[in-house]
Amino acid sequence: ILKIILFVMLYDLKCHRLWWGGDILNKIFGTDGIRGIFNKELTVDLSMKIGKAVAHVLAPNSGKIIIGKDTRLSSDSIECAIASGVCSCGSSAILVGVIPTPGVAYLTRKNRANAGIMISASHNSFEFNGIKIFDRNGYKISDEIQRKIENLIFSDFYDVSFPIGDKVGSIKQEKGYMTQ
């Protein structure tokens, strides 16, 4: 019972919340990005919030974010949600379609994008999906950037203004990126 009191893991549909010594830590990111069962832990709503947060943190002021995906059925829904979130912050979403994870990292750097997002759950079974985020150099984002993204999501974008009119971003399908 004492162990249970000292460490309790609570689970809700969108994130893991760890309680330790009175502090609640909201955590979306795992060891290698964000993963979960589609429409349970990893929802369309959360995916859109991730797109908004990534654009706000890594691509402010009309940046460019490359988005790739694997062939899972849920990847299309997640891609649309992330792209919508990115555009709502004034950045452009460049959809490169089905591509291996290292391809997104490479294209992000080569095309001088502000960030790259890969939708894939790698070796996990089909009901899972995941989101991996790369910085402008094609590297996995740091723990500090992960915390900034999580903080924005859990604050429900408090004190964040969103563009309107011709300042919103656009979605571009760039299938030709695979030949680079």
Positions of the model-derived regions?
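Generic structural "secondary-structure junction" signal
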Residues: T31, G36-K40, V44, T101, ...
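An N-terminal, well-structured beta->alpha segment
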Residues: G22-S84, S88-C89, K167-Q180
